[in-house]
Amino acid sequence: MATPEVIVEIAALRKRFGTNEVLKGIDLSVTRGEVIAIIGKSGSGKSTLLRCVNGLEQFQEGTLTVDGQPLLYGNAAAMRALRQRVGMIFQGFNLFPHLSVGRNVMLAPTLVKKKANPDCTEQARKLLERVGLAEKFDAQPEQLSGGQQQRVAIARALAMEPAVLLCDEITSALDPELVGEVLRVVETLADEGMTLLMVTHEMNFARKVADRVVFMHAGRIHEVGPPEQVFGAPQTAELKQFLSALH
């Protein structure tokens, strides 16, 4: 059996904001097609870890490799290449309000990959169809619900054909009735073999979709394992307390 290909490799990663160390030696390997759910209290370092993976935050110690390429802050070309391999979706949808839905999806491939306009248009239509919004190509973002806007943001991230997709609490800004439609799109991506690294408060979703769940506490990974182990047989007092507080 072939060894799974490692897409994200994080080793001994430390990140400080001034004197406050928020990531205290993170080690994590993510293989192609794996879905990782990162859970933990606010302030445990979850979002900061994701922002380190795509180069939005600079870490002070350790190494981080994405799709075989080390993250090199001093090398502008390497950072541009990294950001093409890493898609990221945030809590806020961050769509450009003056551009149509289709143009939002087409923007990065047109500007960054220099794709021809007809190719980008066709790709954008296909991606919007994937997220269930084929009929919204010419709509303006303001005409969409929050759930629809977040699905456009997913399509936009996929337009760069990333090796890994980072999702940072992508349902936390949504009304409860809109959460399901976004999670269904993410579940479909997981089924199709997309490599996903997700910070989430949706525990049932993590239990259902994730291959492994990472529990972070106070800047460290306290536990990592399959959902049935992390949720069903927590090993540390911190995870037990975190899970009991959810009920």
Residue ranges and their predicted role:
Residues 5-227:
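ABC family nucleotide-binding domain
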Residues 217-218, 224, 228-247:
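C-terminal boundary and immediately downstream tail of ABC-type ATPase nucleotide-binding domains
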